[in-house]
Amino acid sequence: SMRALMILIVAALADRLDAAVKPDHILQDPQARVFQTIVDVELQKRFGAQMALYMQAMRPANAVNGNGVLRIRPPRGGKRRTVPVEFRTFALGPTLVNQYAVEEGTLTVRAAVGKDTQYEWATPNQKPEQLDVEQAMQSFAGADFWMADLGLEMLRWPNQNVIERRLRRGELCSVLVSRPAKVTEGGYSKVVSWVDEDSMGIVRAELFDAQGKLLKIFEPKAFKKIDGQWHLKEMEMRNDQTGSRTAIVFELKPAPKP
């Protein structure tokens, strides 16, 4: 039977699918004694492809239900808003389905390893609209998070390079640079993610606009332990160009056992 799962945008201490293993540089050199700054471009690509595949395959160990709020702080002078949001996630065969429902509509993100992400936006009494990746490069419910951010779209881009390993927040991280096949106006030119090598969760990401300027910064802010596993409780996206910022705060609880 289908099992309800709560995948938060960045999974912490997650299980993996059998098909994915941690990148070679982590398995072969866990203390980063050999691989620190990675100069060899072929190694950058190999480690990057392995890392993106592993992160696509991550799943939480147990089901979690979630409600929460978007706390939206617009550029200076604007009125702050709080938007209630409901989260629902379930597995449909090899596909992971994430739904984010606000009053104005529901975003459904369908993701399977190695396949294009499918985005669907449904408003009340309207036929659901299928969005391509470029169309998903738009704000979700007026927040600084784009729909494509919620789908971790950058992990599916063809160009993935691990360029170095360094400490961040006291944890050894791989620095993953993700670039799309082509840069489109209004989209991203690259995303630089600091990935904790233990949990394989993102501890910081910098997202650059089509002109190569820093646009947004993503950071997880708080975690909660449920059934012995850490889950993301709060995360923030701030716009470096406008000064706006959005926090997503999750109210988490274990899902009822099927």
Where in this protein do the model-derived segments appear?
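Buried hydrophobic packing residues in well-ordered domains
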Residues: 66, 99-100, 126, 170, ...
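Sec-dependent N-terminal signal peptides
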Residues: 4-12
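A generic structural motif
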Residues: 69-75, 101-103, 121-124, 179-181, ...
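Extended lipid/amphipathic-ligand handling interfaces
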Residues: 55, 85-90, 111-112, 219-225
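Flexible, processing/modification-adjacent segments and terminal tails
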Residues: 20-26, 37-50, 57, 78, ...
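N-terminal leader/targeting segments and the immediate start of mature chains
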Residues: 13-80, 88-94
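One face of beta-strands
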Residues: 64-70, 98-100, 117-119, 189-191, ...
